[in-house]
Amino acid sequence: MEVNILAFIAIVLFISVPTAFLLIIYVKTVSESN
């Protein structure tokens, strides 16, 4: 169970961090466009 939980956390971080980074860039681009 512990390994599965750690793997789940690692996957969530691996997906959420780049997504948040791209989202921030997108918001900045839209703000500059407007």
UniProtKB/Swiss-Prot annotation:
The keyword Plastid applies. Coiled coil: none annotated. The gene is psbM. GO terms for biological process: photosynthesis, light reaction. One of the components of the core complex of photosystem II (PSII). PSII is a light-driven water:plastoquinone oxidoreductase that uses light energy to abstract electrons from H(2)O, generating O(2) and a proton gradient subsequently used for ATP formation. It consists of a core antenna complex that captures photons, and an electron transfer chain that converts photonic excitation into a charge separation. This subunit is found at the monomer-monomer interface. Its main location: plastid. One of its GO terms (cellular component) is photosystem II. The keyword Membrane applies. The lineage of its organism: Eukaryota, Viridiplantae, Streptophyta, Embryophyta, Tracheophyta. This is Photosystem II reaction center protein M. Belongs to the PsbM family. PSII is composed of 1 copy each of membrane proteins PsbA, PsbB, PsbC, PsbD, PsbE, PsbF, PsbH, PsbI, PsbJ, PsbK, PsbL, PsbM, PsbT, PsbX, PsbY, PsbZ, Psb30/Ycf12, at least 3 peripheral proteins of the oxygen-evolving complex and a large number of cofactors. It forms dimeric complexes. Keywords: Chloroplast, Membrane, Photosynthesis, Photosystem II, Plastid, Reaction center, Thylakoid, Transmembrane, Transmembrane helix. It comes from Cycas taitungensis. InterPro entries: PSII_PsbM, PSII_PsbM_sf. It is a single-pass membrane protein. It is found in: Plastid, Chloroplast thylakoid membrane. The chain crosses the membrane at residues 5-25.
